């Protein structure tokens, strides 16, 4: 069992026992690029932490060049926004590959593709993805000539899902990523998303059939969650939890890493039952106000949504088609439910949400 952790600015940063997923991704990286990979899972299940661990600690820095484009927290509404996220402008009179070689000596990944100022101005002026993709491909080919394997990782890709530049930008990106992987075998591509509705749309997209694959980063199963509690209790509280205490924590928050961390941290100043009841009460209030807003606008919709949620009183996970498509898509979009398109199942985003549903309805 591997335990990997660090302290940054006094905060405990989670990373724990994702060896199965790490092994799968490292195996992909060792082969030739041939598919686009979508890394998905419930909210706060540890997707970004997993990728960060691989970038920072698991790959050979002399062999790979990683471009990690994080769209989280960035407002993208127009072409210029997209370009500014994708590229890093520089003014030196050097080739992009030379800039890249100098930068990767000090950092594990680059947050944008280095681009000379005059080139970036031309790209912005023409407003066409053709020039963008051509430039990126040339940079990636230069990296390959240097004996290194490029990797592109885009976090929260769904943020550009509705953006149009001569058609939907997302489809142009998909086509380009397929070209980089399945056609040219030039660059590994990973797309991260916690938006399971977006993943379902990708999964159903005919143009991507046999060109993409999926890696699920789910909340911990019970066995791993209990071991994670042992690990955190030793590190944060300098003591062990009893089996009953761990079972109680799991019954409230399940295997959601961030919620387990929150519980253990609060135990420094509060009792366990008080902490768990407080967290559940907070989740119930959020759900109550969410349903109240719906009821005020449309009582018929409220009744349908309440009926759908009541199905979870007996089961944590159900077949997706048990809930009408428009209702399930609404609940997934609002992050009440998580959809797994590969299994065709729905479940609450966390045990905490599940407990709130059971007690409120």
Swiss-Prot record:
Record has Nucleotide-binding as a keyword: yes
Xref: CDD domains: AAA
GO molecular function, one term: ATP hydrolysis activity
Matching InterPro entries: AAA+_ATPase, Archaeal_ATPase_domain, ATPase_dom, MJ1010-like_2nd, P-loop_NTPase, WH-like_DNA-bd_sf
UniProt cross-references to Pfam families, sorted A to Z: ATPase_2 (PF01637), MJ1010-like_2nd (PF21690)
ATP-binding among keywords: yes
Top-level taxon in the UniProt lineage: Archaea
UniProt KW keywords: ATP-binding, Nucleotide-binding
Residues binding ATP, per UniProt: 41-48
Family: Belongs to the archaeal ATPase family.
PANTHER family: AAA+ ATPASE DOMAIN-CONTAINING PROTEIN (PTHR37096:SF1), YALI0E33429P (PTHR37096)
Protein name per its UniProtKB record: Uncharacterized ATP-binding protein MJ0439
Biological source species: Methanocaldococcus jannaschii (strain ATCC 43067 / DSM 2661 / JAL-1 / JCM 10045 / NBRC 100440) (Methanococcus jannaschii)
Lineage, broadest ranks: Archaea, Methanobacteriati, Methanobacteriota, Methanomada group, Methanococci
């Amino acid at each position: 069992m591997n335990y990997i952790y660090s302290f940054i600015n006094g905060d405990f940063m989670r990373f724990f026992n994702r060896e199965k997923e790490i092994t799968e991704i490292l195996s992909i990286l060792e082969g030739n690029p041939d598919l686009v990979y979508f890394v998905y899972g419930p909210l706060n299940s540890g997707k970004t932490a997993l990728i960060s661990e691989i970038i920072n600690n698991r790959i050979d820095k002399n062999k790979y060049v990683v471009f990690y484009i994080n769209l989280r927290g960035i407002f993208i509404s127009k072409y210029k926004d997209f370009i500014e996220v994708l590229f890093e402008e520089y003014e030196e009179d050097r080739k992009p590959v030379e800039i890249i070689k100098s930068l990767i000596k000090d950092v594990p990944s680059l947050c944008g593709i280095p681009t000379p100022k005059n080139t970036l101005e031309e790209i912005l002026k023409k407003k066409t993805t053709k020039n963008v993709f051509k430039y990126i491909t040339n940079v990636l080919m230069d990296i390959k000539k240097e004996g290194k394997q490029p990797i592109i990782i885009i976090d929260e890709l769904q943020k550009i899902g509705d953006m149009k530049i001569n058609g939907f930008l997302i489809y142009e990106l998909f086509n380009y990523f397929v070209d980089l992987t399945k056609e040219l075998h030039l660059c590994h591509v990973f797309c991260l998303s916690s938006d399971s509705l977006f993943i379902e749309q990708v999964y159903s997209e005919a143009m991507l059939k046999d060109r993409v694959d999926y890696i699920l980063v789910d909340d911990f199963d019970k066995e791993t969650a209990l071991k994670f509690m042992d690990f955190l209790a030793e590190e944060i509280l300098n003591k062990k939890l009893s089996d009953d205490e761990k079972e109680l924590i799991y019954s409230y928050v399940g295997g959601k890493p961030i919620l387990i961390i929150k519980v253990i941290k609060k135990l420094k100043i509060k009792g366990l039952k008080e902490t768990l009841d407080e967290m559940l009460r907070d989740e119930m209030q959020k759900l109550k106000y969410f349903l109240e807003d719906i009821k005020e606008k449309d009582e018929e919709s409220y009744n349908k949504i309440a009926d759908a949620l009541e199905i979870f009183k007996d089961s944590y996970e159900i077949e997706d088609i048990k809930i009408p498509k428009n209702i399930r898509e609404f609940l997934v979009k609002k992050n009440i439910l998580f959809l797994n398109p590969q299994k065709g199942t729905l479940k609450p985003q966390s045990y905490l949400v599940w407990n709130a549903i059971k007690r409120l309805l």
